[in-house]
Amino acid sequence: MPDMKLFAGNATPELAQRIANRLYTSLGDAAVGRFSDGEVSVQINENVRGGDIFIIQSTCAPTNDNLMELVVMVDALRRASAGRITAVIPYFGYARQDRRVRSARVPITAKVVADFLSSVGVDRVLTVDLHAEQIQGFFDVPVDNVFGSPILLEDMLQLNLDNPIVVSPDIGGVVRARAIAKLLNDTDMAIIDKRRPRANVSQVMHIIGDVAGRDCVLVDDMIDTGGTLCKAAEALKERGAKRVFAYATHPIFSGNAANNLRNSVIDEVVVCDTIPLTDEIKALPNVRTLTLSGMLAEAIRRISNEESISAMFEH
């Protein structure tokens, strides 16, 4: 069996080290930096010939820099005769640009990135909670899309929730919320229906379901600026919700996210470590992080040993 080796770019160094620790190994020796003009510089400083290589790199902000690091590392390893290269992308950037809405003149950038990764020699992709699962079909190589929900669910069960109800922040997240509700002792579910009555009128949030006197668990795949999430929490509290917890896999936290969360009525925001948090976000008392290192380490081990990934999520 080929030697398994882990390498990491600069996007998620702490997560990469945690994964390596879980696998009782060390990260491979690679110098990933910049030339004086800002171009990505990569040098692999150990033998990888015939190896089973895993590159751990989220394509989070700065998205283009991290994506280029990943593809240049793949090229360097391919030219060094690596046997198989798996791109471990905990957070897959550009995933929200996955279709042309109403035939608008816009790119399908998720497909562009998929083609880019395939063209440089990626043999397989391992990612977490793709924004749209059909993005797997954009790739010409196998894609394992694993789920953060078991880690989030395990934490939810420790909260001592009082008469809980799972809330989807929009119509598109109903399938995710329903799955969590079923696993959370088959609890009830509510949906927030956001709509604008007419142009230039503020968005109105209609809550489908009874949340009065209950602990609400908002679930989503990602939190970006947090603006919509915070407004959803306000709407739930106005409808009599007792406490509001927000769970998401990917903590993008861009723009005014820190201020939004600091001033929100959300009791706690729980996210995973697919994207590093800024110091400002880390300082917020209502934000907590869970690690996916154990799950990703197990997925990497299974891929390397040609074992089933789906078996990890069978209940």
From Swiss-Prot:
What's known about how it's activated or inhibited?
Activated by inorganic phosphate. In addition to form a complex with ATP, Mg(2+) also acts as a cofactor. Strongly inhibited by ADP (or Mg-ADP) through competitive binding at the activation site and at a specific allosteric site. Competitively inhibited by Ca(2+).
Q: Which residues bind D-ribose 5-phosphate?
A: 196, 220, 224-228
EC number assigned by the record: 2.7.6.1
Cofactors per UniProt?
A: Mg(2+)
Q: List the catalytic residues.
A: 194
> Binding of Mg(2+) 2: at which residues?
170
Q: What does this protein do?
A: Involved in the biosynthesis of the central metabolite phospho-alpha-D-ribosyl-1-pyrophosphate (PRPP) via the transfer of pyrophosphoryl group from ATP to 1-hydroxyl of ribose-5-phosphate (Rib-5-P).
Protein name (Swiss-Prot/TrEMBL) = Ribose-phosphate pyrophosphokinase
Native species = Salmonella typhimurium (strain LT2 / SGSC1412 / ATCC 700720)
Gene coding for it: prs
